[in-house]
């Protein structure tokens, strides 16, 4: 419930800022968030009780300095990461649902990851070319060809890199 309320608050805030300055990005806007809220208070629904207390010109100088703690002080973990990303104008799950053309050897399907390897599932192509999902580890610097539909995949690291479990590969020999 909180996530829905805060998410709708952020979308309303972003829409108000964009509407107030159509040629400038949120980060480039120099007016405080409280200015937009005061000018557009009618655009905010009655159920948005979090915004008037948290977004004010006293606590915020620019939208770029807004922190999750100002919007929802109890957010932690993945929820906090999602809210931080939304405040920055990006969606955290953009890398979780890759879309694109069928991957070939010359132009493989690119799958984004925060780490050097990731589990990926291949459902095949469209329509008659679909098959049961084939799950596999996709690793940085290595192409993978689906054994059923021959689609090619490659990993693009967009985060810190390293192993997803936080341990180096050299630790594997100690767990046998």
Swiss-Prot record:
<keyword id="KW-0809">Transit peptide</keyword>
<keyword id="KW-0479">Metal-binding</keyword>
<keyword id="KW-0862">Zinc</keyword>
<dbReference type="GO" id="GO:0005739">
    <property type="term" value="C:mitochondrion"/>
</dbReference>
<feature type="transit peptide" description="Mitochondrion">
    <location>
        <begin position="1"/>
        <end position="55"/>
    </location>
</feature>
<feature type="region of interest" description="Disordered">
    <location>
        <begin position="157"/>
        <end position="176"/>
    </location>
</feature>
<dbReference type="GO" id="GO:0050897">
    <property type="term" value="F:cobalt ion binding"/>
</dbReference>
<feature type="binding site">
    <location>
        <position position="149"/>
    </location>
    <ligand>
        <name>Zn(2+)</name>
    </ligand>
</feature>
<dbReference type="GO" id="GO:0005743">
    <property type="term" value="C:mitochondrial inner membrane"/>
</dbReference>
<dbReference type="Pfam" id="PF01215">
    <property type="entry name" value="COX5B"/>
</dbReference>
<dbReference type="GO" id="GO:0006123">
    <property type="term" value="P:mitochondrial electron transport, cytochrome c to oxygen"/>
</dbReference>
<keyword id="KW-0472">Membrane</keyword>
<dbReference type="GO" id="GO:0009535">
    <property type="term" value="C:chloroplast thylakoid membrane"/>
</dbReference>
<dbReference type="GO" id="GO:0046872">
    <property type="term" value="F:metal ion binding"/>
</dbReference>
<dbReference type="InterPro" id="IPR036972">
    <property type="entry name" value="Cyt_c_oxidase_su5b_sf"/>
</dbReference>
<dbReference type="GO" id="GO:0045277">
    <property type="term" value="C:respiratory chain complex IV"/>
</dbReference>
<keyword id="KW-0496">Mitochondrion</keyword>
<protein>
    <recommendedName>
        <fullName>Cytochrome c oxidase subunit 5b-1, mitochondrial</fullName>
    </recommendedName>
</protein>
<dbReference type="GO" id="GO:0008270">
    <property type="term" value="F:zinc ion binding"/>
</dbReference>
<keyword id="KW-0999">Mitochondrion inner membrane</keyword>
<dbReference type="GO" id="GO:0005829">
    <property type="term" value="C:cytosol"/>
</dbReference>
<feature type="binding site">
    <location>
        <position position="146"/>
    </location>
    <ligand>
        <name>Zn(2+)</name>
    </ligand>
</feature>
<comment type="function">
    <text>This protein is one of the nuclear-coded polypeptide chains of cytochrome c oxidase, the terminal oxidase in mitochondrial electron transport.</text>
</comment>
<dbReference type="InterPro" id="IPR002124">
    <property type="entry name" value="Cyt_c_oxidase_su5b"/>
</dbReference>
<feature type="binding site">
    <location>
        <position position="122"/>
    </location>
    <ligand>
        <name>Zn(2+)</name>
    </ligand>
</feature>
<comment type="similarity">
    <text>Belongs to the cytochrome c oxidase subunit 5B (TC 3.D.4.11) family.</text>
</comment>
């Amino acid at each position: 419930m909180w996530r829905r309320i805060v998410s709708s608050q952020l979308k309303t805030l972003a829409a108000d800022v964009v509407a107030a300055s159509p040629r400038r990005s949120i980060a480039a806007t120099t007016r405080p968030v409280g200015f937009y809220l005061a000018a557009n208070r009618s655009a905010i629904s009655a159920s948005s009780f979090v915004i008037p207390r948290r977004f004010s010109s006293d606590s915020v100088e620019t939208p770029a300095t807004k922190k999750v703690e100002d919007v929802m002080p109890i957010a932690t973990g993945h929820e906090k990461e999602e809210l931080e990303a939304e405040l920055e104008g990006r969606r955290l799950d953009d890398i979780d649902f890759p879309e694109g053309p069928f991957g070939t050897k010359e132009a493989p399907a690119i799958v984004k990851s925060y780490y050097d390897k990731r589990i990926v599932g291949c459902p095949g192509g469209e329509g008659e070319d679909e098959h049961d999902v084939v799950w596999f580890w996709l690793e940085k610097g290595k192409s993978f060809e689906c054994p059923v539909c021959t689609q090619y995949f490659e990993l693009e690291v967009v985060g810190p890199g390293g192993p997803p479990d936080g341990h180096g590969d050299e630790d594997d020999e100690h767990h046998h």
